[in-house]
């Protein structure tokens, strides 16, 4: 027997639609940044580091609201790819701070341009007011559901 409480319409599910939209954005962004030698896995960390260099892994984890192990793997790949260097903190040699290489700094403009192009294309069907409302709603949901880090948040100053 069919139970209406168990029905699920993926086309009316915020979670399903957000996930689907995120995959579409990621696919389009990936196509634009791979030629730069970047990936969608490293792009969020670069966005933070382009704003504030010299962060610790822990600060990046908090800023991006991701798992420590995921961040460790991402930083290892970024170091391998010549995007970052890790240097001991001057005050506490046990702490490693993350710095961008000249190569990574030089990729900021083309990578951000690629992301803006993807955003503009994706949000093209919406009016300016709808875009603003959409971004505002997503930001509010993230703030209400997340850990407090998210869009617009910056790691604590050192």
Per-range role (PLM):
Residues 13, 17, 24, 28, ...:
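Pre-recognition alpha-helix immediately N-terminal to the DNA-recognition helix
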Residues 52-56:
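Short capping segments at the starts of secondary-structure elements
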Residues 67-70:
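Helix-turn-helix DNA-binding motif, specifically the short coil turn and the N-cap/start of the second
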Residues 26, 76-143:
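Charged, amphipathic alpha-helical coiled-coil/dimerization segments
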Residues 48, 63, 81:
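Residues within the alpha-helical elements of helix-turn-helix
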Residues 1-10, 128-158:
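C-terminal regulatory/oligomerization modules of transcriptional regulators
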Residues 1-36, 100, 155-158:
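N-terminal leader segment of winged-helix/HTH proteins
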Residues 22, 47-51, 112, 139:
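Short, locally clustered residues in the helix-turn-helix/winged-helix DNA-binding domain
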